[in-house]
């Protein structure tokens, strides 16, 4: 396979700091029982949460708990991420600086609205990395880039920071911000405005070589609905999804992991590209369909590269 072909496929199955990043599982900050349980789950990434799952009166204690968790825990293959509070809150700045003392793999940033928001946090992290003698860029960022309306029109600029490894989206906060009465129709499908935001997140992430991460599915008692949404997301081009309940993790991992049949087909397609490339041809028929460029090498291909 040529170098160009390899470059074309490396985005399609995304990796975090420690391995694959298919499932990103929220763990409420300060809840020792849930944290201990999460370490035994098959989630690729754990998001230790200091924002929505923590009441205002418990914010400082939860921050101290999370710092202690990171300091004392061997996460193994699980990526350790922390969702801090927004920087315009009472807790945001202290969250960032305190968590940086124990060096997580990355931060999940809620309610960012502009490139200036991301640049500011990037600058603070860079300063703290230098103070601690670690490589600049070691700590990554994942943006929740659609929680305020203004952010949707700034996603491309926000994602341009080299520190940004992924972009996800969310309908919950956005629905309140725009005054939406519902997020889904009677069939469980997103209303048009949320479909637009979902697609915009995907396109902005891919355009900036960041991972597109699909939003949480809040109906934890509807595994069939989750599976359908995972399939739609994977078909669109998302390579991971956020989870909020342990029962969701295996469904998400399965949806964003290629089957053996897909891997076999990808291997055949790679071989066909190489054969026709040697013959000076870049358009040919593969399994009854026209293959005309390296973009046909999608998610399963990376498993054989």
Give the role of each language-model region:
Residues 2-299:
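Expand to "…catalyze enediolate/carbanion chemistry for C-C bond making/breaking, isomerization
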